[in-house]
């Protein structure tokens, strides 16, 4: 690693920020180290580049050469380090908008940090998307009311108000987003769905867009799928070692059905992707039918549902079974037809994985029966049901211990030491003063043993099956409470996501 000094001049009051496009194309990052200007560069930077940076900076700087991979990581970290710039772009928008900017297409492949377009509405959208990615938001809500326009981000599963731009921006903002997502810009009376694929700071991001008419204009929700921020290993999902070992064994079975249940946004798809990634190999043919394809898995054949051309889950699943699969993943079992094909596939030598929108693991069994699946078929095919939720994890920099109240001891339903403490959120700069940073899963894994199989075959009720499994299967709330006692999350979080249980 080399370091050398250019000619010395005085340091300006504020070191200029090099444009991202220049920094990436020419391989330089201008920063400071202990008050001294420092130019970090990748190998082979041209002398002309150093002279140009010297001219722009107006001062001397040290030059330090990094390896190519190290430089790329530092480049992205440097230009994503300060989210206040993105927020300032949004707050500084004037009241006068350039209406002609709406007609200008933003190329799908353009990197938003490269954008040099001064149209305020485009700057607003660019800044909003960049800010959401930096905050690791899963959704952006743009809500129009009588007097205000509200932008909210869903961060760690909880909506947080970010900004209230000028109310007059509403129609311009919605129209531009509809243009980007290939929607009918003139149709405002019916809901529409669209999709945007773009890059932000070198990161591939898919955006699912949904609009809906409301009293004072259209509401827009953007679901962000940051392909660089997905955890595709079972050990990263927060499972206990025992559950992880059981899941690892189950997904290597030659045939049967494994179901993952939980409400929307509980991480079901991520769990399935992690399971497929673990067993993905050259000697297995793994095929999926999804709506939508959230993440690309190398070596896995993935098919997108398209109801406009009658490409449904059921039709896709039928076609997949003619493609000689070993493992089949169905994004969701929504109807009897899909359920019947999935069961038949599992009985004819295929391992099938899918999701159901039920609140409990046992609820998945009764849901399949209610759909019309015969109990004897279900008992023969079902291997296991995994119920899961996501809870926010406490910020390790500011969490603080507190005693447990008597009411909380009753809610936890387990014997605890008299001086047992739990942790509470406090809030600091590291967690944006929320007390939480990131999320983890809590799980309940029901393995279908002979006793449960017999209960399903005899059409026993949900409560009867619940009694059978509870002796040897910890509930999802118990798994959450174990994480509370370890200081990973708060009791309030676990109670929030498991109240219906």
From Swiss-Prot:
Keywords: ATP-binding, Cell inner membrane, Cell membrane, Membrane, Metal-binding, Nucleotide-binding, Protein transport, Translocase, Transport, Zinc. GO terms for cellular component: plasma membrane; type II protein secretion system complex. ATP binds at residues 262-269. PROSITE patterns: T2SP_E. Its EC number is 7.4.2.8. GO terms for biological process: protein secretion by the type II secretion system. It is found in: Cell inner membrane. InterPro entries: AAA+_ATPase, GSPE_N1E, P-loop_NTPase, T2SS/T4SS_dom, T2SS_E_N_sf, T2SS_GspE. Zn(2+) binds at residues 395, 398, 428, 431. Disulfide bonds: none annotated. Its cofactor is Zn(2+). ATPase component of the type II secretion system required for the energy-dependent secretion of extracellular factors such as proteases and toxins from the periplasm. Acts as a molecular motor to provide the energy that is required for assembly of the pseudopilus and the extrusion of substrates generated in the cytoplasm. NCBIfam families: type_II_gspE. Forms homooligomers; most probably hexamers. Interacts with ExeL/GspL. This is Type II secretion system protein E. It comes from Aeromonas hydrophila. The lineage of its organism: Bacteria, Pseudomonadati, Pseudomonadota, Gammaproteobacteria, Aeromonadales. The gene is exeE.
